[in-house]
Each structure stands twice: as C-alpha cells, then as structure tokens.
Amino acid sequence: MSKRKRPEELRSHRWLGVSDLRAFGHRARLRQGGFDDADFSGKPVIAIINTWSDINFCHTHLRDRAEDVKRGVMQAGGFPVELPAMSLAEPFVKPSTMLYRNLLAMETEELLRSHPIDGAVLMGGCDKTTPALVMGAISMGLPAIYVPAGPQLRGNWRGQQLGSGSDAWKYWDEKRAGRISDAEWAELEGGIARSFGTCMVMGTAATMMAITEALGMALPGASSIPAADAAHPRMCAAAGRRIVDMVWDDLVPQKLLTPAAFDNVIRVHMAMGGSTNAIIHVVAMARRAGIKLDMNRFDEISQEIPVLANVRPSGQFLMEDFFYAGGSRALMAELSSALNLSCLTVTGKSIGENIAGAEVYKPEVIHPLSDPVSREGATAVLTGNLAPRGCVMKPSAADKRFLRHRGKVIAFDDYNHMAREVERDDLDVTPDHILVLKNGGPKGGPGMPEWGMLPIPKKLLKQGVCDTLRISDARMSGTSYGACILHVAPESFVGGPLAFVRTGDEIELDVPARRIHLHVAEEEIARRRAAWKQPAPRYPRGYGALYLQHIGQADEGCDFDFLAAPGTISEPEIH
C-alpha cells in the first residue's frame, strides 16, 4: 500500500484548512451547523451519497442506515456529510429508470467534484442506482465504497414463497388465462413484497449488488445481507469505518478496476445466473475506467462458467435462502478456481483473502462446480443479419426447445400495438410463432424500457402455453424469464435491421451456434430500408433531448458519448 496521506494533503484541505477569506467562510458555515474544530479539522470529509426517497421502498431503510454509516465514519476519525441524490425507483419511474441512469451518474460525479469531499460511501441497490453510483465514482476518482441496500424478505401467499417480479409475471398470466380470481390476485398483491429492500430474486438489483462486490467495491459478503437483517446496519457502520482508511491510503477506484477484476465480475455474474441488464451496466462501468469491454467477452466466459446459484428466476430459491446458504462469499469461494484471486478490493486485501474460509452451508442453494444448476451459461450473445452488433438471451430461464428454432414472425411497431394485439382471442398465432417488438431500444423506448418479456398472447395462455420466442431491442427485468432475445443492436429506431422485419417473415435462432438470422433476401431488406422513415423523437427539449442526442447503443453500455471514457479529472477553483 502507498504511503498514507497527511492532513494537509486531503482534498478538503483546500476548502477548510487554509488561512484565507474563503476558508474562513467555509469554517464559519460549519460552525453555523453546530460543529467545531474537533469535528472536522484535519479529518477526511466523507460524502454519504444517499438515494433514499419516500417513493423508493427498495431504499426505505437507507434514511436510518446513513446514520449507521456516519457512526462508522466518526469512529474512524472522519467527518461525515450526507448528500441526497436522485432515487431511481424501478416500479415508479417512467418510461424507464434506464433513461435516468446516466443522469444519476452525472449527479454523483458532480456532487463529489463540487463539494469538499475526500471519499464517498455510495448507498443504493435498486437496479440502475448501483451502476449509476459506481460510474459517477469511477469518473471522479475519489476513494469510494459501495453500501448495497440488500434484498427484501421472502414473499408469501397461502404458505407459498413468492419472488417479487418473477411471481408477479407468473400469476398475471394465470389471471389473464382465467385460472385465478380477482380475490386471489388481491391477496397476492399484499404478500409479494413484505419488507423494505430490493427484489429478492436474482434480478438486476441482486445481480448488480453482487457483481459490485465481486469488482472489489463493497465489503466482503455485503451484497447478500437482507435489508431487514441486523447484520445490515453493522455492515453500514463497517463501511463508514473503512472509507476513512481508504482516504488516508488513497485507495481510489482506478487501483481496483483492472481487466482481471472485470473478468471476475463476469464470472460471478454467470455463476449467479444474473440479469441480462448487467451486461449493459458492466460495459459502461468498464469504459468509465478506461477498459474496453464488449459483449463477446461475456459470451466467452458464459461458455466456461455454469450457473451455481439455485435462485429464481433460473432456479428455485430466493435471496434470503442464498444468504443463509453462505451468500456471495460462499459462491465466490466455490468459484475460486476460476477467479483472479489477486485482485485488490476496498478492504486493502485481495479478493482471495476476502473469501478465505467461506463455506457453503446449503449446497441445494449454492451448487458446486461439479454439479451446477445449469451447465448452459447464464447468458448467450448472438449475432447475425438481424443483430449485426449483437443481442443477448438468458438460456437458463428459457424453454429449451427454443434454443434452436425457426418460425414465422408476428411484428409489432411499438408497445401499444403489441399490448392490444396479444389480448385478441382471434389473433392468428401458434406456439411456434416468433413475436417481434420494435422501437424499444435506447432511443426508441426511449430509455430501453423492460418490455422484452412480451406477454404471451392470451389465446396461447388459454391453451396452456407457458413460453414462446420473443425478440426486441428492449431490455427485460432481471426478475423476468422466458425465451426472450434482447438488446438487439443497432436498435430499430436508428435503422437497425429489426426495423425492417414484417409479419410473415421467418427468423431462425441457433443459440448453441450463437446465430440469429432473418430469412429475407438482401434485396428485399434494401427495398424496405429505402422506404423506411425514422419515427419522430419523443423529446424536443430538456434532459430527454440531451439523452437522445448523446446516448450510445446497448453494445456500448448505453452511456453518453461525452462520458463514456476516462478523462482529466478537473478540480474546481475556489474563490
């Protein structure tokens, strides 16, 4: 570890430690808040970036947990300041939280840049919050540690364990098919989300919390602690203590984020059976760190690493069970032969040291490499004339008969068109048809909404059909499942081949060969392209207009072009 900083080398010293009029004003304002020299003089100023809000129930507890972080910071001799940031509540933010991920990343970076901050504790968990916080922290380059919100408790309905998201989709289809009543549906509504915390299946929230720990940005085991468990506030206090030492040691993200660390992330993602959304976020995070990472690397590792976590939607159990089985440390220990164990983490130790001694207590929940949940990798990346820059699928959550399939297309121009058609009892559809949704991508959605798990047509549900092949340039919730081809790039809105697919065309999918092909002659595709007109942009002004002008495609991580690479970290002048 490098030589420890002296107090006068702290970034906050420029604001608080010098003898001039500006520093006088800064210190006077701190005294206005009831603080004196013993609170802040010569101490690291630690920002607690808190994404709590009244409408984000994944983060309800973060208001109190921030106090635990402050307790830890003060125990270690730091001065904590809580800075509220945008809270991306997945259920409530429309049209999509993905539209605002980069805005929160920008806010995080600028909060840290514009204030007298020496280090940061990043508090979040709900889906896009985690990558946004990490992306902003990477770009700012200050010591930072991530505090995951943690999963909620198991859902329950009439003695059955429920998984948020996954069972909502399942029982909604049952209701559409007429197999459960309105009264039963109302009971489900009251039992599927029983505590604060993130979705308790292996959705995007659980995936991103776990892989941020695997990246080395969180304390060992932190990502799998349930939000309501007493271990959670203890972890928060420990993170507060640790960030102070990280500041003195100048342990910045750039010292942790190496190509080997990102390979660890992808391996853990595959072993967890993680959300397809993570691919977009990890690519964006890597590029912020100056590491070129593309979807092909995910596919290479997917073919090496099987699924070990028997957690819904790819498995049977829930995140609470995963915690009792040993949690993230146990899974990484089981996977240790495939990990780069020398990678440095926020503890100042290697990931190998962090997972030493971890055990699997419930092998039915965390399987060994010798007996995985699925030998098929968690994610497959496909290319072909329909997706020249790639698309993704989660084979572990799909009906295996669709891994090789050729069928006729039913194409929908937008979400509303699709939503009307799938409810028709007279829709001309069979289980072999392929449903194609256009204009669900980064610009077309806009914000690449989670529309990719298209509803199974009601006509098929009534026949007992549980899965059908669906293709879109949208994303799907990590809690979703089924034979869904996602993230088709380039998207239809910008003239990608998906824009030219028509009802009656045939598409062929071969997941083992990693190919997807539209069986339409090149001449006909060219004719359709010439006749195509781009849809009108949704936003003429404001943040939406900025987003549409600068957003990248799915294979690029959907970052803004002016943020997607590291640059000189500018410091403000103090006048």
Predicted ranges, named:
Residues 103-115:
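Short, well-structured alpha-helical segments in soluble
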Residues 2-54, 58, 65-86, 91, ...:
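Catalytic or ion-coupling anion/metal-binding cores of large enzyme and transporter domains
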Residues 113-133, 144-149:
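A short, small-residue-rich loop immediately preceding and capping a beta-strand
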